Structures are given as C-alpha cells and as structure tokens.
C-alpha cells in the first residue's frame, strides 16, 4: 500500500528533539524549496532543505540519519535530500522516542455506583448465600426508595446490646409527612426472624 501519491516523494527525517523518524511526503514541485516538518510526537519544527548552501550532496551511508534517510530519486536525479536544522545536536545522540498511549483519567464513582456497591455488600453480609442478581435487585429497589445523599441511621436499644440498623436513609421530601419507612428489605426480614 503506497501512502504517497505519484506527485510526491517520500523522505525520512529524524526529529532533532525527540529522535523520532518521520516520513515526509514532499511534493515534487516543492523539492527546490525549504520544507517545514512538524513532529507529531513533540511538535518540534524541523526544516528540510534540498540544497543547503556550500554543502555537497551526501550519500545515504554518510548521512547522519543512517539507513532511515532514503535518496530522493523520483524528481531529482538520484540526489539525497538532507535534513538541515538550526538546532541540530549531532554530537549527543538521544534514545528513540517511545509512543505510549495516553493514561486514562480515573474518575470517582457516581453516587449511584457507590450506593449500589455498598448496598450489595450490606445485603450479602446479612445473607451470604443470596445470589448476586437478587442482591443487585434488592439494592436497586432500595435506591429507588431512598435519598442517597443522607446516611443510614443505627439505633441501639436497651434490651439488645448489639446495634442494629432499623431505618434507611430519610425518604424523599414528598414522603416527609408520613412515617419513616424502612427501605432495607433484608433488615426487615432479619428483625422478623430475630
């Protein structure tokens, strides 16, 4: 598969900042002009010039790019296209740049996800042999019945030294005039059996 059209010539240039090899398609009509090349990794600008002043054409083996610099043969009679950059550091070679995928941004879980996770854990702690599907269904019903912004209350009675959860988070505002309704079905069952 050829990525360069016949009216362009493909040259390879090494970025002077990050040392990445760049493939540059230079139009044949622009081979006599200086071409600006922008690196896709570090956004450094390099300049590609076909005939720098007072420099003889280099062979591909003499060029600092080594095997990556290919001769420009399509439009210029087998002369290589050297790279000229004002910030060239040929004395200090750098390690090749490794392209890494961007890291995913970790977001905090939503209120719904936090509630569901905690509720399923509570239900499974109270009833360890309940299937996850049923625990999820119960947690979803509890989400629909309660206001997740309020926390659950724990009450202690004098007759029982162990604390038990007897009421769910406070219901929505439209239920505020009614009695507080327990929304944790599993705890209702525990109270009846206990």
Swiss-Prot record:
One of its GO terms (molecular function) is zinc ion binding. A zinc finger (C4-type) spans 15-42. Gene3D superfamilies: High mobility group box domain. The keyword DNA-binding applies. Pfam families: YABBY, YABBY_N. Keywords: Developmental protein, Differentiation, DNA-binding, Flowering, Metal-binding, Nucleus, Zinc, Zinc-finger. One of its GO terms (cellular component) is nucleus. InterPro entries: HMG_box_dom_sf (IPR036910), YABBY (IPR006780), YABBY_C (IPR056775), YABBY_N (IPR056776). The keyword DNA-binding applies. Residues 83-103 are annotated as: Disordered. Its main location: nucleus. Belongs to the YABBY family. Regulates carpel specification in flower development. Severe or intermediate mutation in DL causes complete or partial homeotic conversion of carpels into stamens without affecting the identities of other floral organs. Interacts antagonistically with class B genes and controls floral meristem determinacy. Regulates midrib formation in leaves probably by inducing cell proliferation in the central region of the leaf. This is Protein DROOPING LEAF. The gene is DL.
């Amino acid at each position: 598969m050829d990525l360069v059209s016949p009216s362009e010539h493909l040259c390879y240039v090494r970025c002077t900042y990050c040392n990445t090899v760049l493939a540059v398609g230079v139009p044949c009509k622009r081979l006599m002009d200086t071409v600006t090349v922008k690196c896709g990794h570090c956004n450094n600008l390099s300049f590609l010039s076909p005939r720098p002043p007072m420099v003889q054409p280099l062979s591909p083996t003499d060029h600092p790019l080594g095997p990556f610099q290919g001769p420009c043969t399509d439009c210029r009679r087998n002369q290589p296209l050297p790279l000229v950059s004002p910030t060239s550091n040929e004395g200090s070679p750098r390690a090749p740049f490794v392209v890494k995928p961007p890291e995913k941004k970790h977001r905090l879980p939503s209120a719904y996800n936090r509630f569901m996770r905690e509720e399923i854990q509570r239900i499974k702690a109270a009833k360890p042999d309940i299937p996850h599907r049923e625990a999820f269904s119960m947690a979803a019903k509890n989400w629909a019945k309660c206001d997740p912004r309020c926390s659950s209350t724990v009450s202690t009675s004098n007759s029982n030294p162990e604390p038990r959860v007897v009421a769910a988070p406070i219901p929505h505002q439209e239920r505020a005039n009614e009695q507080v309704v327990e929304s944790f079905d599993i705890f209702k069952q525990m109270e009846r059996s206990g």
